């Protein structure tokens, strides 16, 4: 089938990061994908080699719709393209890929149909596809063979090859955060133990004396960023794409959620914590809630990370729970097959 995937780059490259992984995964499974994006500049470092089966075009390109049209995160395809969808026979399946959330509405809303009553899309149906962490949702992006590659991977060798080898006794921590993150408080907490802090993207940390070593990394390709997460003992991640990839790493992680002006991000953060920490030992769960809340500006005062061993066990158990569910692209292909 031919897929059209529409993406608008709002800020921070998170939207295009998710869309590229989706397009590349579809292409790797033999699908033909046209990725429509209003600013493709980030793909130069995010995916420098491209991907089989994926063509990238500008938002104003002249091309007709294929079999399936996905608008990512309610980005609204151009009206002329929607009008062409309404005239095509057979009509393409129109899917709105929503943002990831652990909140209860996701299971209620996943798979709902929205008949379009206004031009240019009158007569079309739009279907809502919600990624999620539980059965009854659309699942998470996870390429076939990802876990086999993860289990074969030698993180210390990968760091060594890039001149990032930790010293004996150092833990390795990656930092990818928004500018409002309480980085100074984090550095103070990390400085109590020999630590190599690798900052990704635009996270800039001034050199510090003592047992904390800080190294700045350039923007990494998606495949190299995955390997960075696999190589670290603790990962600080942000947004949606790196958040999901940290869970596949199976290492302790802390998520900085995208802040919303109305404060809705707090409920979204707590909904995820309730899922991940369900069944966790109470002291560990309380420590992680305090840490995540402090990192997201939802509480004041320091919050020390919990002991590494139980946190590591929790991260792997959570990953195993997610692996028991079908991945997003497998579910998406089934979703489309049922409706065509």
Protein language model features and the residues they cover:
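Extreme N-terminal starter segment of soluble prokaryotic enzymes
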Residues: 1-4
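Active-site and donor-binding regions of nucleotide-sugar-utilizing enzymes
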Residues: 6-123
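A conserved mid-protein helix/loop that constitutes part of the nucleotide-sugar donor-binding site
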Residues: 17, 180-188
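A donor-sugar binding/catalytic signature common to diverse glycosyltransferases
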Residues: 20-23, 220-268
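Hydrophobic/aromatic beta-strand patches that form the interior of the parallel beta-sheet core
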Residues: 34, 57, 70, 93-95, ...
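A nucleotide-sugar donor-handling region in carbohydrate enzymes
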Residues: 98-181
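Catalytic donor nucleotide-activated moiety binding site of glycosyltransferases and closely related
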Residues: 191-218
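C-terminal amphipathic helix plus adjacent low-complexity
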Residues: 278-340
């Amino acid at each position: 089938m031919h897929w059209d995937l529409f993406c608008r780059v709002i800020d921070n490259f998170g939207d295009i990061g998710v869309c590229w992984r989706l397009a590349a995964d579809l292409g790797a499974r033999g699908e033909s994908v046209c990725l429509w994006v209003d600013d493709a500049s980030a793909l130069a470092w995010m995916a420098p080699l491209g991907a089989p089966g994926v063509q990238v075009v500008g938002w104003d390109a002249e091309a007709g719709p294929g079999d399936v049209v996905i608008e990512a995160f309610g980005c609204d395809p151009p009206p002329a393209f929607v009008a062409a969808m309404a005239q095509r026979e057979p009509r393409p399946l129109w899917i709105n890929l929503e943002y990831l959330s652990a909140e209860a509405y996701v299971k209620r809303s996943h798979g709902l149909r929205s008949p379009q009553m206004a031009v240019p899309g009158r007569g079309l149906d739009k279907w809502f596809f919600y990624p999620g962490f539980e059965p009854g949702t659309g699942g998470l992006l996870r390429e076939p063979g990802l876990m086999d590659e993860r289990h074969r991977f030698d993180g210390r060798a990968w760091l060594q090859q890039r001149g990032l080898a930790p010293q004996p006794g150092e833990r390795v921590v990656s930092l990818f955060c928004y500018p409002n993150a309480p980085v100074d408080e984090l550095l103070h907490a990390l400085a109590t133990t020999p630590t190599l802090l690798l900052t990704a993207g635009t996270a800039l940390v001034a050199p510090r004396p003592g047992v904390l070593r800080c190294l700045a990394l350039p923007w990494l390709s998606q495949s190299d960023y995955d390997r960075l997460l696999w190589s670290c003992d603790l990962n600080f991640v942000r947004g949606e794409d790196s958040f999901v990839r940290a869970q596949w790493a199976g290492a302790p992680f802390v998520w900085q959620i995208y802040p919303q002006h109305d404060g809705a991000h707090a409920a979204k953060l707590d909904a995820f914590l309730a899922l991940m920490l369900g069944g966790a030992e109470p002291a560990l769960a309380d420590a992680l809630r305090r840490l995540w809340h402090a990192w997201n500006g939802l509480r004041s005062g320091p919050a020390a990370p919990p002991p590494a061993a139980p946190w590591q066990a929790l991260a792997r158990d959570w990953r195993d729970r997610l692996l028991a569910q079908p991945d997003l692209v497998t579910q998406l292909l089934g979703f489309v097959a049922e409706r065509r």
